[in-house]
Amino acid sequence: MHAPGALFYVGDPHHAMGDGEVALTAMEGSLRGTFRLTVCKEGEGDAPRLAHRYPFAETADAWIPIGLSDPDGSVDGQGSDLDVALRTAVVNALEFLEQELGMDRAIAYAYLSAAADFTISQVVDRTVGVHGIIAKSHFA
């Protein structure tokens, strides 16, 4: 199913995969799932504003800003695709901390540097990804 602006994709399940998926494969597996999707309009519900423009995940324990590179490679000399993905994840994390938690940008930057974890999601496809982990316990 394709819907413009849906920002939802599921597939390519892995039973095991190291951080970064570097060799085009992992412990592949089958997937059977039931999903219930709810349309969340901007300004309504609990979804952060950022999630309406860019992939963003949330678990019971963490907020997860995501950064992806351009599948066609670097643009305007911005550096490697991984650099672009990391920069995008950090910018998305900053926006989340400022807009949703009311944090000053300079404090948010310092927090991300000192306490958040940024991990390579995968580098095997044309689009590479980085995701951040912002622990909710830091804000309890």
Where in the sequence are the language-model features?
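A hydrophobic, small-residue-rich beta->alpha segment in the mid-to-C-terminal subdomain
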Residues: L50-A106, Y111
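Glycine-rich anion/phosphate-binding loop at the beta-strand->alpha-helix junction
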Residues: M1-R53, V91, R105-A106, Y111-G129, ...
